[in-house]
C-alpha cells in the first residue's frame, strides 16, 4: 500500500442527504404499511355545526352540541370548539377503517419536495427577511462593535450569558412553546458564544436544547399541553405540579450539562465536538472580528443593535398576545430592517447588496424546511399515519398501569417522528389514547404528560422536525449533534419515566 495515499475517512451525510433518504423511505413505507383512516370531526363556525369527514363517503353535519360529542365518544368541552381553542380536525375514537392502498411512486419524491416547499413558504420568507436583516446590520459593523464591548465586560464570567440565555429559552418553551421562532436568535448569539471562547454547539444547546427541554415539560404552553389536555377532555392544570417538577429537573440537567461542556472546551478547545470545523465557523460568523482591534461602539451602532434586540420581544408579544404567525413576524422584522436601513449611513447599493447577501446565506436552511414538509406530505397522502396510531393504541391497550404509561411514552416517541407538530399530534392522538387511560384506571393527565415527554424526546433528533434546520443554519454535522444531545435525551426519558410511574403509583394507593 502506498503510504503517501491519504487514508479515506467517512464523512457523515449532510442534512439534505439525510432528509432525501428519509423521503425515499417514507415512499417505500406506503407500499408496506396498510392505508387507513379515522373519521375526523371539525367545527364549522359559520353554520354552528360539526362536520364529520370519513373516507369514501359524503361529509355529514351534526348540531354543535354536547350531546353530539358524547354520542361520538369525544370527551372535549363544546366551548373548546366554539371559542376556537381547537381548530384542527379531531380523530373520532373507534372509527378507524382500512382503505384502498395509496401507493406513492418515484414521481412523488420530487413532487412532494416541491409541494412541501410551497407549504413552507411562510417560514421561508421569515428566514429570508431575518437573513437580510442580519446582513445589513453586519455591514454597519454594529455586531462586531457590540461583541467587543460584551467580551470586555464579561471577561471571567462568560458562562453567565449561557446561563441567562438557557433560562430564558426554558421559560419560553414551557410557557409559549418557542421553537421555530428561536431560529431568529442564532445569527446574533453564535458570534457572541464564539467570541466568549465557546463553540457553535453551545449556542444550539443554550437555545434549541433549552427551549425544547422547556417545551417538553410544558406547564402552560398553548401549543402542546393545553391543546392536548383539551383534546383529552381535561383541564390543562391537571398534572401541572408534576410537569413543573419535571421542568425544574430538566432545566437543571441542561444548565449543568452546558456548564460541564463549556468548562471542558475552555480548558481544552480540542474537546469541542466541532473542533475540526472551528476555523470555518469563525470565518463565517466572525470574519471581520478581531479582538486585538478597536471598533468604536458609536451611538448609531448602539441604536441599531437596540432596534435589533427590540424586534424579539415584539415578535414574542405578537405570537402570545396578537396571534401572530410567520407572515406577521416576517413583516415586523422587515419593518425594523427598513428603519435600520435609513439610519445605517450605508449607501443604497450597500444596503441592497448586504440584504440580498444575508438572505442568500439562509437559502439552504429554507430548502431544508421544504424538504422536511415533503416527508410529512408523503406520510399524510399515503394515509399510513392513522394506521400506525391505531396499531400502537391496540398494543398498549389493556396493559397494567405502570407498564401501560411507559408503553405510552414509547408510543409517543415513535409518533413524534411521524407527526413532528405538537398540536397536530395532540388532536390526532389524544382522542384515541386518552380514553385508554380510563380502561386501566389512571387519570388522563398522565397520558398528556407521556405525550409531551415522549414526543419531545424524539424531536431532539427527528430529521422531520426543527433540528436539521438548526444544524444546517450553523453548519453543524448531524453526528456531532447526536453525540452531544444523547445524554440529555437520556435525562429527559429518565425523569419522565420516573415521574410517570410515581404518578401512577400515587393514584393507585
Swiss-Prot record:
Major location category of this protein: membrane
Coiled-coil annotated residue ranges, if any: none
Cleaved signal peptide residues: none
Keywords in alphabetical order: Cell membrane, Membrane, Transmembrane, Transmembrane helix
Subcellular location(s) per record: Cell membrane
TM region(s), chain numbering: 14-34, 117-137, 158-178, 188-208, 209-229, 240-260, 303-323, 324-344, 359-379, 399-419, 423-443, 458-478, 484-504
GO cellular component: plasma membrane
InterPro entries per record: C4_dicarb_anaerob_car-like (IPR018385), DASS-Related_Transporters (IPR051679)
Membrane-topology descriptor: Multi-pass membrane protein
Family from the record: To E.coli YfcC. To B.subtilis YcgA.
Protein's recorded name: Uncharacterized protein HI_0594
Amino acid at each position: 500500500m502506498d503510504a503517501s495515499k491519504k487514508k479515506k475517512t467517512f464523512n457523515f451525510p449532510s442534512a439534505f442527504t439525510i432528509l432525501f433518504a428519509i423521503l425515499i423511505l417514507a415512499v417505500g413505507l406506503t407500499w408496506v404499511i396498510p392505508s387507513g383512516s379515522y373519521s375526523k370531526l371539525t367545527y364549522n363556525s359559520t353554520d354552528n355545526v360539526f362536520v364529520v369527514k370519513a373516507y369514501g363517503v359524503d361529509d355529514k353535519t351534526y348540531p354543535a352540541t354536547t350531546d353530539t360529542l358524547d354520542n361520538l365518544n369525544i370527551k372535549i368541552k363544546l366551548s373548546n370548539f366554539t371559542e376556537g381553542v381547537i381548530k384542527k380536525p379531531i380523530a373520532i375514537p373507534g372509527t378507524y377503517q382500512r382503505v384502498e392502498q395509496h401507493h406513492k411512486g418515484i414521481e412523488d419524491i420530487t413532487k412532494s419536495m416541491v409541494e412541501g416547499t410551497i407549504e413552507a413558504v411562510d417560514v421561508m420568507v421569515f428566514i429570508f427577511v431575518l437573513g437580510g436583516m442580519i446582513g445589513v446590520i453586519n455591514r454597519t459593523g454594529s455586531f462586531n462593535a457590540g461583541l467587543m464591548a460584551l467580551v470586555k465586560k464579561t471577561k471571567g464570567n462568560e458562562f453567565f450569558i449561557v446561563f441567562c440565555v438557557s433560562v430564558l429559552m426554558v421559560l419560553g418553551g414551557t410557557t409559549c412553546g418557542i421553537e421555530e421562532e428561536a431560529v431568529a436568535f442564532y445569527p446574533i448569539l453564535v458570534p457572541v458564544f464564539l467570541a466568549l471562547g465557546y463553540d457553535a454547539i453551545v449556542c444550539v444547546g443554550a437555545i434549541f436544547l433549552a427551549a425544547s427541554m422547556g417545551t417538553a415539560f410544558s406547564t402552560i404552553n398553548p401549543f402542546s399541553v393545553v391543546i392536548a389536555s383539551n383534546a383529552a377532555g381535561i383541564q390543562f392544570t391537571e398534572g401541572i405540579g408534576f410537569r413543573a417538577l419535571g421542568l425544574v429537573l430538566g432545566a437543571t440537567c441542561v444548565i449543568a450539562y452546558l456548564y460541564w461542556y463549556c468548562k471542558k472546551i475552555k480548558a481544552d478547545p480540542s474537546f469541542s465536538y466541532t473542533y475540526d470545523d472551528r476555523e470555518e465557523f469563525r470565518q463565517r460568523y466572525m470574519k471581520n472580528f478581531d479582538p486585538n482591534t478597536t471598533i468604536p461602539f458609536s451611538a448609531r451602532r448602539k441604536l441599531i443593535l437596540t432596534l435589533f434586540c427590540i424586534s424579539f420581544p415584539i415578535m414574542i408579544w405578537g405570537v402570545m398576545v396578537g396571534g401572530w404567525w410567520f407572515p406577521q413576524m416576517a413583516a415586523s422584522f422587515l419593518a425594523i430592517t427598513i428603519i435600520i436601513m435609513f439610519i445605517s449611513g450605508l449607501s443604497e447599493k450597500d444596503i441592497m447588496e448586504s440584504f440580498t447577501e444575508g438572505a442568500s446565506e439562509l437559502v439552504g436552511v429554507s430548502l431544508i424546511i421544504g424538504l422536511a414538509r415533503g416527508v410529512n406530505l408523503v406520510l399524510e397522502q399515503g394515509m399510513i399515519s392513522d394506521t400506525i396510531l391505531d396499531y400502537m393504541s391496540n398494543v398498549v391497550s389493556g396493559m397494567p398501569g405502570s407498564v401501560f404509561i411507559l408503553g405510552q411514552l414509547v408510543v409517543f416517541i415513535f409518533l413524534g417522528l411521524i407527526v413532528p407538530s405538537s398540536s397536530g399530534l395532540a388532536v390526532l392522538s389524544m382522542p384515541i389514547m386518552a380514553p385508554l387511560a380510563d380502561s386501566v384506571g389512571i387519570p388522563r393527565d398522565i397520558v398528556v404528560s407521556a405525550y409531551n415527554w415522549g414526543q419531545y424526546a424524539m424531536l431532539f433528533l427527528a430529521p422531520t422536525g426543527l433540528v436539521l434546520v438548526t444544524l444546517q443554519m450553523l453548519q453543524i454535522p448531524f453526528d456531532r449533534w447526536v453525540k452531544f444531545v444523547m445524554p440529555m435525551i437520556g435525562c429527559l426519558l429518565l425523569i419522565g419515566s420516573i415521574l410517570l410511574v410515581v404518578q401512577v403509583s400515587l393514584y393507585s394507593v
